[in-house]
């Protein structure tokens, strides 16, 4: 059973992309949370999924997905598979999803959940999301569900010219900014950066990010 009520709620709270709302309506968030939290899955709030990680607030998931402006033929890199809920949503909205998760237990769990539900256009990789997935780059879009302290140039370099990245950036444990970054069309031009929302995401772990 999907979340038709959630899609209606999100529509009334500012999410306008009909494709995003339809995809959310097709998914049941309770399928992606620990069994003892399934009764809480209907709430518009983040929930713990173990190993210090969370499944994000549904409104934030929808906002991030809408900001990618997916049309259906994109190749998308996801940093932080987590529960697999965001992965499933992206899978319904683009051609291919490449998802990286650093926590082995979460990577395995998400792979199993999405496999049971028949998602076939998702490739998984266990490892350091701060490095992206260089051998599959470039991507039309990148979505990160963990926050580095600064904009990671390693990930930005894996976008196609004109590609979009949605990423929370800011201090560990503090308020971060959810950014929409569009890579310039021509070498030497400055990317376009827009702040969408103040958020608090788990930190992006892994090796230090290269800034040049």
Curated annotation (Swiss-Prot):
InterPro entries: PCMT, SAM-dependent_MTases_sf. The keyword Coiled coil does not apply. It catalyses: [protein]-L-isoaspartate + S-adenosyl-L-methionine = [protein]-L-isoaspartate alpha-methyl ester + S-adenosyl-L-homocysteine. One of its GO terms (biological process) is protein repair. GO terms for cellular component: cytoplasm. Keywords: Cytoplasm, Methyltransferase, S-adenosyl-L-methionine, Transferase. CDD domains: AdoMet_MTases. Its main location: cytoplasm. Pfam families: PCMT. Its EC number is 2.1.1.77. Signal peptide: none annotated. The keyword Cytoplasm applies. GO terms for molecular function: protein-L-isoaspartate (D-aspartate) O-methyltransferase activity. Catalyzes the methyl esterification of L-isoaspartyl residues in peptides and proteins that result from spontaneous decomposition of normal L-aspartyl and L-asparaginyl residues. It plays a role in the repair and/or degradation of damaged proteins. PANTHER family: PROTEIN-L-ISOASPARTATE O-METHYLTRANSFERASE (PTHR11579), PROTEIN-L-ISOASPARTATE(D-ASPARTATE) O-METHYLTRANSFERASE (PTHR11579:SF0). This is Protein-L-isoaspartate O-methyltransferase. It comes from Myxococcus xanthus (strain DK1622).
